[in-house]
Structure formats: C-alpha cells, structure tokens
Amino acid sequence: MKQLLLLWIVCCCPLLLQAQSVQPSGKELLLQAQADYQIGRVEQAIATLENFPSTDEGSMLEEVYRLLALCYLAQDNANRVNRYVGLLLKVDPYYTIRLDDPVRFADLIRANRVEKHTLVTASQQAGTLDEAPVPVTLITEEMIQAIGARTLQEVLTTYVPGVFPLEGSNVNLSMRGVYTSTQENILILLNGHRLNSHSSNAISPDYRISLENIKQIEVLRGAASSLYGNVALTAVVNLITKVGKEVNGLQASYSMGNNQTYKGNLLFGQGNYNSDLLMWASLYHSQGEKFDIPWTSEDAYGYQPQAGSIYVNGYNRKPTYDLGLNYVWNQFKLTLNHRHGKRVSPYSVGITSMYDYDRYAKINGNRPGRSTASTFGVLQYANTFHNTSVDASFSVDYEHISHYVVLGDVTTSPLTIQNELYPDYVSDTVGVFYVTNWRNLTFGGEVRALQKYQWGAMSGNFLLGLQYEHFHAFDNSFQMGDHFKHIGMTVTNEDSYTWYGMGDRLYFVQNGVEQNFSAYSQIKHYLFPRLILNGGFRYDRKIRYDREKLNEFSPRLSLIYLPNDRWNVKLSYARSFVDAPFTSRTFSWHHLLPEEGLQPQHLDSWQLSSNWRYEPWHLEYDANLFYTHVTDLVQVVENLFSNGGNLRMMGLEQSLTFQFPHLWIHGNLTYQHLLNQTDYTANDTYVYSVPNFLMNWVAEQDLSPWVKQLRLHAKCSTYSKQYFKYGWSVFHGPDDWYFGRDLVRMPAYALVDVGLRYSWHWFDFQFDCKNLFDHTYRLGGSSVPILQPGRSWLGTVRFRIR
C-alpha cells in the first residue's frame, strides 16, 4: 500500500508543477492586457482582465480598473466605464490624471472624484466628504493648476471660504476675522505632520511649501483641537503628497517672470507593488516688485518722511527652497523634509520707515528679513488586523529661526527725545538693526488605533490615540548693531542688558524645555443608516519651561444627516486652543514684556452646514452658517502681553461648482459680521484689515475639441472695503505724537488673473498673469497698509521622462 501511495505522489508532482507553471501571475496578466490594449485588441484585454485575481495588491488593482475603464471607453459602454471609474477611485481616491489618459476618461475622473473622494484629515481615518463631521474644503491638483497657483496662500484664499490674505513681515492669513501678526492660528500639516513652528507656532504659507508635489489639500474649517491639539484654532490644512508610482519617472520645470523671478522644480517618483519612492526639490528667487515712493506719498512713513523705495514679495539673499522624500516599504513609511524661507520686509520696524536693503551686511548668509530653516523626519508604521487598524510614528523636528530686523536707516525721531526705546548710542546713529536667533529641537511619538464594531443593526468605529512631544530651545542669541554692519551688542541665552533710561528693565533671550502629553478619542456611530453621531475629545497636558502646568480639554460633537446620496445636513460644536508661543512667553523686547502666566487662546465654534448635488449637471452647492467666540486673545496692554481680548463673529459661507464636458466653474462667497469685541484689532463694526464680504470665481476651459491639450483659466477675486488703524510705532510727521490715532478706509477692489496651459507630448507650457489690469491696492495686517504687486507674469516649461 505504501509503495502504491509513493508511486501516485511521484506521478502527480510533475502534473502539479506543470499546472502551476501555466498559471500566469497577476503581473503577467496585467502586462498581457496592456499589450493587447496598445495594439487595439480590446476584447482580448477585457477577457484577460476580467479573470484577474481580486486578492492581488491594491496598486495592481488600480491599474486593472483603469485599463478596464479605458477598454470599455473604446467600446462606448458607458455603464461599464462608470463602474470601473468608481472602483478605481475607491482603490485610489487620489488618482492623478496622466498625460496619456484620454480626454473623455479624464473628464469622468474629474466629475466623479469630488463625490467619491476619501478624506483622512476630518476624522484621522478614511471617510467621504458627506460623512465628514465638520465643513471640509477639498482642493485637488487640477484645482491648483486651474488658477496657476504659486503659493499655498493663493490656493487657500481662492478656494477656502472665509480666508483672506494679510501683509506683514511674512505672508499671513485671517480665518473668519481671526488673525495675529504671523500665521499661527491655522495648523498646516504635510501628510499629517505638523509644519507650524514649535517655538513660535507660525508657518508662512509661501514659496517654502512646494505645490508641485501636492496631490490634494484637505481643509477643516473651524475648531479642530479635539484631534490635532495645539494651534488648530481656526482651521487645519493637510497637504497630501503624490505617490511615486503615479509620477512614474522624472518631472522637471523651470519658470521665469518679471522682477527677476526664477523658479525650478524637480519631482521623481517610482513605485511597485510593495514599495514607493517620491522625491521633490523646489527653489524660488525673486527680487520682488520695487516701488519708488516720493516723500509726499501716503506710503511714506517716518518721523521725517523722505523719498525712498520698498520691495514687496522679495525672496532673496538666501533663496527659498523645499526638499523632501517619501519612501514606503510594505507597512513602513519614511518622510524627510528640509525647507528654508526668507521674505524681505517692506518697511523697518520701530519707526516704520523705508530703508536701503542692499546697504545692510550679510549676517549668517542673509540680508534683512525673517528667515526660517526647518528639517523634520517621520518614521511611520501602519497595519490592519481584522477590524483593528494601528498606526504608530516617531518624529524629529529641528528649526533655526533668524530675524534680521532693520530699525531704520536714520532713527532720528521722538525716540531721541524720550530716550525710552533704545540705548543712548542708538538714538543718534544710522543703519540700526538687530538679529535674533532661535534654535530648537522637538522629538516625539504618536500611536493610535481604530476599532470597527457592529451592534445589531448599528455600526461604527472608535479611535483612540496617544501623543508625546519634547521641545528644547537652545543656542538662542540677540545681536544689535549700527552703521549697517557693525555689531555693538550681543546677548546670549539668559544674559541681560540694561537699557538706558529704562530703570531696571532688562532684555533677555530664554532657553528651556517643554513637554506635552496628549490623549484623544473619537467615536463615529451610525445611529440609523442615515444618521451619524461623530464625537470626540482631546486632553493636553503641557509642562512649560518654568514648570507651570497647563491642562486643556478640547471636545467636539457632530450630527450628520444623510437623507439621500445627493444631500446632507451637519450640525457641529467644537472647542479649540492655541497656546501662547514659547517665544512670546520668554522673549522680552525692551518696552514689551510677557505677562506672567500667559494663557492659551480659545475658540468655541458652532456650525450648521449643508451640501447638495445635482449629478446630471455635475453641480454641487455647499452652505455653512457659523458662529465663533474667541476668548483670551493675547493683546498688548500697558506694555504687557496679556490675555485680555475676545471676539464674537458670525457669517455665511457658500460655494458652487459646475462641471460641463469641457468647462469647469467654481465660486465661493463669504459674508462675515462682527457681533462684538473687547481689546481686539477691531471697532464696533469691522475687524481691521479684513473685509466683511469676500467672493472668488474660477473658470477653466478645455479647448481640446479645437486645439488639443490646450486649457485656458481665469480667476476673479472681489473684496469689500476694509478699515485699518495704524500701529503704535507709525509717524506721519513731526507733529504726529499720538500713536495709533488714524483710522483709514481702504476701498473695495477686484483682481483678475488669467493663464493658459498647453501639453505637447512630454512637455507642458504654461503662462500665468496675476493682477491683469494692474490694479493698485493695499493689504493690512501689519503696522501700516502695504502696497501689493501690480501686474506680474510667470512662464513655465515642464517636461516628463518616464
């Protein structure tokens, strides 16, 4: 019997091996189908792909669904095309339209993407726009291209209702009337990792953040500290990068424009079924637009106004750049990023006058401006076990901030008489400046788990997360000089310097260590098939450098009603906070001192939103009614930074999108109203420097039926009047002794941008013109209204190598 069994095994083994050898792998089936499709054997390709094993990797399934959709498109089988386009977007919600994708296929992707798109920011888990617990603005790569966007600020102010650009030493934003001197109330993330400074909370949404590597941007409008903690006061912006396998080669571009503007980008991507690599590099330089200002102009400031010039939007004497890498291997992901940005300040501080930028010496490789260089690395592990998903990460952030600030070419002013703001030798000299340097290192880790559950007819999921951050500020210094290059004073760490005429008041720069422990949870529960409860809270415990302990609770509760697939209604409440920055709590500047025990700012937000779609017209309408109450705003009261301000705002945000066969139109409109305020940059009716009415319209026309691969785009932005109150340091002449007395009205205005994009084989040609009609206008947000660039242009050549 044993001999017969052995003989049977020996005979069957070759047959089994032969059977295995003739069974093609999933990769071989896909390659065969691609070859058949390329030579027009569509039916054979379909037959091969219909037998594709569904257990293969998602990255391969994506290509299978794409190829099936293309095959059925060639057969004009609309039902099958729509089916596989939907499956493709389900596997890869971030699918990027390729150069060789047919126009009809690209239109179907665009028409279905917004409705089928998956979000990860709203709940830190995959979900649709319909089920997001708060109002979300989704900005795709095509939408970024449709406005010829150059900076993240331009993208956000165009597509996100309630966001308005502001001026200052760095690019700034207001959200629903809330802003500070730098952008530190909106949390900006790159693939979920914080980009805001850990010492100042600030991040400038300008050229230091490349857009070439971005696949989509998810914007949570409203308080979001329940998941993201500190800084997520008014909104969260998550930048989702492209995937290497979609880039599939090298992309390079070179741009040139007026005002000695140059920009270069490199993007490389490659991927297979268990690994993916994406690398990017972006470099930007611009002299900025130079305005020659006569001494009689309203833009000439100073105790004794003189003729001079200012540079607006200058980025030079170090250029601005963004370098990064994403590498995925199975369940592991590594992200590395290094960025630098330095913007030229139009005016000096202190007496707010024009200055000769080129006369000031280079210090640490920089001329005057606020420079930030930051580097971070994140190692992440993610896996799914049955109904539980686990995600763990470890990150390290290093930052070097250098503020090279000009006080004035000539400092003669009432300051000389009062002798209160500067040492004696400063008041009677020229070319006065100071340089502050901060270095800080932050490391930490985060782990979270998502558990799905089923309770009878009800289902949902539960999210639990823990986070730890360790912040260390070190090697901080302050230097002050005169005659454009001479360093007369240096203070490091906790050294002190006695200011003449100031009694015992001292200047110091503080080092220190701070720790933050966080725990957060969220539940998404389907009460009924059409009614969802989404709630959560976060607890943050912070130990400050002086051992003061901070405890913050951030709750959120949302009800989402989905009567059908075309309409939804959401009601939500959330509370958020932003802690007073480390630099504000430790950095004393002669006449301005931090109040002991400076506390976080808080925001309570109520929102009622609704979304409606009419698919035959590819029309989508979104409306959101909001009410916000901001408390503990940090303001300057009697030379002290203190928590004295509050602000109540309400408003209506609306957006509308049309998608026609060859025309895409998007518009948004915001009306916001100040209810009341205390000790804020506002009067009884207006928040200073922010309009009550904002409107944007964007249109992109595909001319492929007439001129293949040619697209035209246009944008019109309209803003109502604004009011501006001059800062404490502004002078308009020797008789102007009452600081901050002037309230000026800045008229309403509209700006028009146009552009075109043409593709030819592996090349793209793009031309964009901003402020087409060369309109003169000013933006507030700083101590004075600042002139903005007139008509500007930028031409781009881009090529791809696969």
Residue ranges of predicted features:
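Periplasmic-side early beta-strands and strand-to-turn transitions of outer-membrane beta-barrels
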Residues: 246, 271-362
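Gram-negative outer-membrane beta-barrel transporters
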Residues: 526-532, 618, 624-629, 642-727, ...
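Short strand-turn segments of transmembrane beta-barrel domains in outer membranes
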Residues: 236, 241-271, 276-281
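A beta-strand signature from Gram-negative outer-membrane beta-barrel systems
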Residues: 208-253
